[in-house]
UniProtKB/Swiss-Prot annotation:
PANTHER family noted in UniProt: GLUCOSE-6-PHOSPHATE ISOMERASE (PTHR11469:SF1)
Active site location: E355, H386, K514
Subcellular locations according to the entry: Cytoplasm
Stretches that traverse the bilayer: none
Protein name as catalogued: Glucose-6-phosphate isomerase
Gene Ontology BP terms: gluconeogenesis; glucose 6-phosphate metabolic process; glycolytic process
Catalyses which reaction(s): alpha-D-glucose 6-phosphate = beta-D-fructose 6-phosphate
Length: 548
């Protein structure tokens, strides 16, 4: 993978000049000039997904110049490097192979001279066997009862992905009830345990090292809760499984290492739902549906690896994002799913994007002179319309938005879905085209308002429009289409990291806070005044001690 400063390329300089031509061009004028604009700026994937990027402040020339940037920064070479098992996470000396976890073609993928696929397939087979036993009721707890509830204990990638997917695929859920605990705040585990029966509860402890502070604190509290009812520590083996690589620590905890599901250093946390970390998904929806999730992601992997940049969906979305972030100065992107089951999708890719590309140092170790990762946020529609869309429509910030919706609802109640989708279509139209002062004045006049009344209110009713959006319309949210959608965003993030010359797959920014917390924790053990920090931190710690 080459280390090329994008801002020093000819393509970047051409984009800067092109931006001067484009900065005042409106989306409405682009549509007025081209009645084929939708056809030119949209694409379908596998007859399951339509991506419409026509309501953006771009022309064919914009995309050509952005694709020149991808060529100059050797995106094609970087894609080959990732798929071939090269150690592109150089700060940790690791390959990046979440694509191997869903490699349904089973073609060899080699790391350090060894094909990883036999081990991947062995873990999948072990997961299937485990899921079949638990779901069928063959797996019994310490009193001989079948499992009814599963608690996934993890944090970050070991929580956000499985929680997001199990929520998104709730229509496929079986009889098992899924619970997710992540926060080290004792309230989270305490509230999760309140309705549960120790005789019928299975815990999944998800920690690669089996040392993650938050996860192991919660796991020990869960074990204490369980043993307060079960008594015999030998019973732990029937109610706890581990998603880890530390067999020694897993065994010492009381878990049978036969019920330890491994993954590898080349699986990054925020890309790990496809691995053993996804065991909670497989338990929730059944292993066959988990395999369909993998198949959907694999189909998008093939599209990403094999499709030319000008038709490559992750690449196109990535380039458009760079255009806004680095040339228009847009600092945030909103992800707005019009599907209640997808309510955790924005939070999942908030982590996926911000932890991956929230870097200020390039791959040469130098501070960058351009923008890297944007701030990602969002809520399901139509809730967001009654919360923050006001600012998107009429505020002073440019906020590119991704609107996501299924054509087919899993809950076709009355006309709910038609009303939901009418809002989906209306919002992107309103954001793009707005409402002029002339239209507002004519509307008021037709309603019989006096000129004075019109003049008093009209300016506040104007919508400038020219707010960019992508619309991603799925046929239906299925395991396959969800897998493809997640992989689409994963590869968008990777593409942006390549072009922006940063390391996408490490996360050193999470380390300093953890180090300082480990230093502060012993200081909280007694009531002595703390003086070892700055005046603010000392005062906060001492007030906490005084009040607790």
């Amino acid at each position: 993978m080459k280390n090329i400063n994008p801002s020093q390329t000819a393509a970047w300089k051409a984009l800067q000049q092109h931006f001067e031509q484009m900065k005042d061009v409106t989306i409405s004028s682009l549509f007025a000039k081209d009645d084929q604009r939708f056809n030119r700026f949209s694409a379908t994937f596998d007859d399951q997904m339509l991506v419409d990027f026509s309501k953006n402040r771009i022309t064919s020339e914009t995309l050509e110049k952005l694709q020149d940037l991808a060529k100059e920064t050797d995106l094609a070479g970087a894609i080959k490097s990732m798929f071939s098992g090269e150690k592109i996470n150089r700060t940790e000396d690791r390959a990046v192979l979440h694509i191997a976890l869903r490699n349904r073609s089973n073609t060899p993928i080699v790391v350090d001279g060894k094909d990883v696929m036999p081990e991947v397939n062995a873990v999948l087979a072990k997961m299937k066997q485990f899921c079949d036993r638990v779901i069928s009721g063959d797996w019994k707890g310490y009193t001989g009862k079948a499992i009814t509830d599963v608690v996934n204990i993890g944090i970050g990638g070991s929580d956000l992905g499985p929680y997001m997917v199990t929520e998104a695929l709730r229509p496929y859920k079986n009889h098992l009830n899924m619970h997710f605990v992540s926060n080290v705040d004792g309230t989270h585990i305490a509230e999760a345990l309140k309705p549960l029966n120790p005789e019928t509860t299975l815990f999944l402890v998800a920690s690669k090292t089996f040392t993650t502070q938050e996860t192991m604190t919660n796991a020990h509290s869960a074990r204490d809760w369980f043993l307060s009812a079960a008594g015999d520590p030998a019973h732990v083996a029937k109610h706890f499984a581990a998603l880890s690589t530390n067999a020694k620590a897993v065994g010492e905890f009381g878990i049978d290492t036969n019920n330890m599901f491994e993954f590898w250093d080349w699986v990054g946390g925020r890309y790990s739902l496809w691995s053993a970390i996804g065991l909670s998904i497989a338990l929730s929806v059944g292993f066959e549906h988990f395999e369909q999730l993998l198949s959907g992601a694999h189909a998008m992997d093939k599209h990403f690896a094999e499709t030319p940049a000008e038709k490559n969906l992750p690449v196109l979305l990535a380039l458009i994002g760079i255009w806004y972030n680095n040339f228009f100065g847009a600092e945030t992107e909103a992800i707005l799913p019009y599907d209640q089951y997808m309510h955790r999708f924005p939070a999942y890719f908030q982590q996926g994007n911000m932890e991956s590309n929230g870097k200020y140092v390039d791959r040469n170790g130098h501070p960058v002179d351009y923008q890297t990762g944007p701030i990602i946020w969002g809520e399901p529609g139509t809730n967001g319309q009654h919360a923050f869309y006001q600012l998107i429509h009429q505020g002073t910030k440019l906020i590119p938005c991704d609107f996501i919706a299924p054509a087919i609802s899993h809950n076709p109640l009355s006309d709910h879905h038609a009303k939901l989708l009418s809002n989906f279509f209306a919002q992107t139209e309103a954001l793009a085209f707005g409402k002029s002062l002339e239209d507002v004045e004519a509307e008021f006049a037709a309603a019989g308002k006096t000129p004075e009344q019109v003049a008093h209110v009209a300016p506040f009713k104007v919508f400038e429009g020219n707010r960019p959006t992508n619309s991603i319309l799925l046929r239906e949210i299925t395991p396959f289409s969800l897998g493809a959608l997640i992989a689409l965003y994963e590869h968008k993030i990777f593409t942006q990291g390549v072009i922006l010359n940063i390391y996408t797959f490490d996360q050193w920014g999470v380390e300093l806070g953890k180090q300082l917390a480990n230093r502060i924790l012993p200081e909280l053990a007694d009531d002595q005044e703390v003086t070892s920090h700055d005046s603010s931190t000392n005062a906060l710690i001492n007030r906490f001690k005084n009040w607790r």
